[in-house]
Amino acid sequence: MRSRKLTGGVRSSARLRARSYSSASLASARDVTSSTSAKTTCLASSSHKATDRRTSKKFKYDKGHLVKAELQKLDPKSDISSLPKVAPVAPCENKFAEDSAEAAVSVPESREPPQGCSTPASEEPSVKAENGLSTEPSSAAAAQEPDDSSAGQAEPVPRTEEVRASVLQMDSSIFLDDDSNQPMPVSRFFGNVELMQDLPPASSSYPSMSRREFRKMHFRAKDDEDDAEG
């Protein structure tokens, strides 16, 4: 009976232990699952945040890229507008310049006589005639120059006529009218002022005297008058 009771007690204790172990294992499993679920939620949230950041960065990069592309599209137009406009060179002008250059090159070649041909004898008289014509006008011009110089020396302009002309010009001006408020010229009262400037200053006949001497002379004259009256 006792052995049965002991075995029954051992079995019950083993059952209790098994139950407690199973409950502990279940609790630990629940903790593990809860921790894993928390980790998964954290990872999911972090992954969502990372994806959001990446998408925002991509959006910003795309925006910046689009803005740069638009600016690059606009820049060439502004560069083209800022460049100075060069007038297009007409092709006919280039052809005309080339033709004139070819003609200038061909003219001296045509002037040179071909080989084996002698110069015509008619050129020598023409050269002589040209020399004669060129020397004749030069001699005539040389003969006219001394005649002009002698005529200029033989006709000097008198100085008095120049002075009279200047006086007449002064009198014919607008500011010398009788009704105007301008002062009259000095030459009308005193003659020609230019001739008066060369004259020496008028010398005083009496020497300069002091004020005392002048007063003495004045009192003496008064005394003489009183004596004459008395």
Curated annotation (Swiss-Prot):
The keyword Chloroplast appears for this protein: no
Transmembrane segments annotated in the record for this chain: none
Record key words, sorted: Nucleus, Phosphoprotein
One GO CC annotation: nucleoplasm
Record field: compositional bias (Low complexity): 11-30
Record PTM Phosphoserine, positions in chain: S180
Keyword check for Amino-acid biosynthesis: no
Annotated compartments: Nucleus
Basic and acidic residues composition-biased segments: 49-78
Disordered, as annotated region: 1-85, 97-166
Biased composition (Polar residues): 31-48
Pfam families, per the entry: UPF0688 (PF15772)
Family note: Belongs to the UPF0688 family.
UniProt-recorded name of the protein: UPF0688 protein C1orf174 homolog
Organism the protein comes from: Mus musculus
